[in-house]
């Protein structure tokens, strides 16, 4: 076995990036990720400075037959960025971003967070679809699809991806686009972590300045009526209006339902569109004209890094009476006031793209249903996990078999297949071409054997 000291010597020779191993004062911080449930000890943490150093790292782990994991933002609930006894390739130091206002495009490095990316593009009044928590990394979000507030107008994050530079398992640095390595480009738009390490993303940007955004809140006693009205409301929503529901508890333990909105259009039109939701007599109404950048960071305080997380997720076509009744039964028993049940509405451009156009296959208008349980005290883990599993079990009659891959924990091959649906066989064939030995296996893994 290659000793850590040998790894550090060989990799650090001529490397501008960092190599951190056990015993280093920086080691525990380097191996920590968003989900405090993840406590794994990699053999070494390597922070490359650029694509050439990523190539060196890939060649090194292949030469020494070492397991590998890759970290972008470290924000996934599964914690695949950290693997026991592996070389952890940490891209967080790669933060270059170049915006071209003439072509409305941006070239961005994989270590950027959503907040860093948005700050650069919003300086010129531009944006592309990204997630809804600014500490999330752009890499994992995009490679898994990328739902966000602009999905109705511009599709998912991966739908605005124009090209990507990717280091494959054999150490080649390839460009993937609709003109080069087209099959690889298809695969990385939804299943990207399986095929290599993306060192640069090129996105199409769109004009986004001020948005009409905020939340309406309603008490539990009115929630069934509110949710039925909301379900009807969103089915007639224009592309420019994106919405989500969040069910949770107030700090005093009172169940509450939030409807969160983002309208990318004229304020007067948006106010008219939102009138039906306001007639439902919300307890609070924070909807206002605000910078898109402010909306993108509005959720950050609710998701501090280091809390313990356990999630369950699936696609939900309709808010049926049975689904609503189940939610009403479970919400008052939610063990942690930090937890929530979310329903992010996917519609518009994101739902009109063909399921076979990208590896992300779930293109029907529907809700991304997510039970997002989070808590701080390790002694509370059992009851939070049990509550999450119980609610997910009772919601099964109303959920599709499919799931958004970015919401998956370590849930087995069946759930990975469900995440890719009809596209899974093509992804297996692509995996055999670009990673037949499954070097990139610390992910929602597509097994090249097809099993």
Model-derived segments and spans:
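Soluble FAD-dependent oxygen oxidases
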Residues: 1-451
